[in-house]
Amino acid sequence: MEPRAIVLKLIEHKHISVEEAEFFMNRVMKGEVSEILLSSFVTAMRAKGESVDEVLGCTLALRKNALKPKTVFPFDLLDTCGTGGDGQGTINVSTLSAITLASLGVKVAKHGNRSVSSHTGSSDILARLGYQTEATQEEVEAHLISRGFTFLFAPMWHPSMKYAGSVRKELGFRTVFNMIGPLSNPFSPQFQIIGVYQPELTELFIKVLQYLGLKRALVCHSRDGLDEFSIFQTTDYTLLENEVISRHSFDPRTLGFSSLKREEVYADSSEHAEVLARRVLNSEPIAGTHAVALNAGAGLFVMGKVKTIEQGYKIAWEALLSGKTRKYFEDLISKE
């Protein structure tokens, strides 16, 4: 295979195979592809529209070149990493729901990064709340064993991504790189929730997760444009269970929500995002707390801890309102 020939196929609006995508991205991860060729590759793929095989191939290359954990974890893992990029400016729902899930006994390996399109990425908000996000590999693995929660800072675990950094920054628009990050948790969790920035990606992502062999996974996009479960509008999601894919919708009205304030979910700055996150963790019954409970409830559903998302929401809501999640997080950061 020759990288230029692969790019030419994409320019001609032809799909490339899993093998071709993996070959090209593997060369990128080794610093063997010029920035001009890489820019052409991701731009042509974006213009054509990324296929399942292309995203899968690029994901396999990123996983192959990531750091590998030295620990064999004796339990099932969940990740709540999403694509971001929905442009909505909501609080860090997936991060706060990950903390809530960990407080309920779910082992969470949260894979994330600094802000890309929002005011605060998962790394940013955790740091603002007092959590050490840039720990060593040994510390990250030890935290999961001892605390049931850990954070994998993507740049540390994917050092080969440095070869793509300047191209991504210069282009400034979403490419296949925005897709493969959430699919490339180095701890290879068996369970995963991914929120995506476009509705059609729920189908693409669940098929990639199916190939990757996850036990159970869920990919969602809400009808008001969020890459998470919405408390305001119906959320459409695909579910992978026992290697079978199914399609569903969740209407938050089934939870009896009324008079929820959007300003309690949306942040206009990193400082505002921190204020809202602290209000959620401090058990205030605001809209943001409902949003976190709903998404944590979906996590309990994916893990098989409950039979429905509604049941999961009620358990997560109680953990947040009772102070259980707050106490867990306080214990977590007191050990930093």
UniProtKB/Swiss-Prot annotation:
**Keyword Protein transport appears in the UniProt entry:** no
Q: In which pathway does it act?
A: Amino-acid biosynthesis; L-tryptophan biosynthesis; L-tryptophan from chorismate: step 2/5
Q: Record's family?
A: Belongs to the anthranilate phosphoribosyltransferase family.
What organism is recorded for this protein?
A: Leptospira borgpetersenii serovar Hardjo-bovis (strain JB197)
The entry's protein name is Anthranilate phosphoribosyltransferase
| Leading EC class | transferase
**Main role?**
Catalyzes the transfer of the phosphoribosyl group of 5-phosphorylribose-1-pyrophosphate (PRPP) to anthranilate to yield N-(5'-phosphoribosyl)-anthranilate (PRA).
Q: Which Gene3D superfamilies match?
A: Nucleoside phosphorylase/phosphoribosyltransferase catalytic domain, Transferase, Pyrimidine Nucleoside Phosphorylase, Chain C
In terms of NCBIfam families, this protein maps to: trpD (TIGR01245)
The record's GO CC annotations read: cytosol
Q: Which domain of life is it from?
A: Bacteria
Where anthranilate 1 binds, per the record, is at G82, N113
**Named cofactor requirement(s):** Mg(2+)
What EC number(s) are associated with this protein in UniProt? Answer: 2.4.2.18
Binding-site positions, Mg(2+) 1: S94, E228
Q: Which GO terms describe its biological process?
A: L-tryptophan biosynthetic process
Question: What gene is this protein a product of?
Answer: trpD
Q: Which UniProt keywords apply?
A: Amino-acid biosynthesis, Aromatic amino acid biosynthesis, Glycosyltransferase, Magnesium, Metal-binding, Transferase, Tryptophan biosynthesis
Q: Which residues bind Mg(2+) 2?
A: D227, E228
Q: Which reaction does it catalyse?
A: N-(5-phospho-beta-D-ribosyl)anthranilate + diphosphate = 5-phospho-alpha-D-ribose 1-diphosphate + anthranilate
Q: Which residues bind anthranilate 2?
A: R168
Query: Which amino acid positions bind 5-phospho-alpha-D-ribose 1-diphosphate, per UniProt?
Result: 82, 85-86, 90, 92-95, 110-118, 122
